[in-house]
């Protein structure tokens, strides 16, 4: 991963190194946006679930063993540090903040970035997120008995929980017409339970419907749904129910978390990026992996695909449903 120099040592974390790796992939577009609009008109909105928490864990362990590290700085573990770091790295003067809403964090960053542009507070927004492995989420999901001992198997009969991954992705939002557009956004709160979805999926359904309404799109116009699909018993059951109610079986769908793991706060942007690449490069839709365990036939049928297939309609829905009933849905589309 890219090294963080001493001039930015207060921001030295694996989380921010992943952000730099993601930034390198869009740096030419970012530089052009800065040159065109000015440093005060480029916003940074990121999502993370843990930020540099692992750096804090390492420091605590060293301190308890009488080996405190001089390299540790408190800002490394702050939730707001990713956006502050990226803004400093690019010498930007526009709005910069980090959202932390668990697994929907970076999807909410996309939504918030669009709203900044619509409100006239920025002309361009760098949106995305990053999350890295640390003890807190591993121990937390273990205490909830939600960690799988093998590769996660969303929507399968023997699914037993999530596999935690790490990753980062960034996108550049702009008013200017682009080949791929953010067509619609939706968000809601269940106000039901801190770690369980609403039993009827009421909030998730509202978020999806908002995104469809925002885009002016009917359910049958969607070509693929990237499901949140964490491989926990309850999440997959409720999401299948929601998709069945809104789309029936007519829209191909799958969860890609068996490929990436659950990247926590980076999941929303990671899966939106997968959707964008499918649209950009005409990639085949990723199939659901039932090689280890067959599909759970007790779930409401919802168009799960078992073999890769082409995208028939150039509109993709991506769902992110987080703890606390924090739901987001975004619609991406290929523009003619």
What kind of feature is each model-predicted range?
Residues 194-200, 230-247, 265-270:
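Short glycine/threonine-rich loop-to-helix capping motif typified by GTGT followed
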Residues 32-43, 60-71, 85-95, 118-125, ...:
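Structural signature of cysteine-dependent C-C bond-forming condensing enzymes
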Residues 48-51, 102-105, 130-134, 186-190, ...:
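Acidic, glycine-rich active-site loops and adjacent beta-strand->loop/helix elements
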Residues 151-215, 224:
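Condensing-enzyme catalytic core mediating Claisen C-C bond formation in acyl metabolism
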Residues 55-59, 136-140, 192-195, 236-238, ...:
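Short acidic, glycine/serine/threonine-rich loops at helix termini
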Residues 1-46, 52-53, 207, 211-219:
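Conserved active-site "lid/cap" helical segment
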Residues 1-21, 51-65, 71-112, 121, ...:
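Conserved catalytic cysteine-centered active-site region
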Residues 44, 86, 106, 113, ...:
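Conserved small-residue
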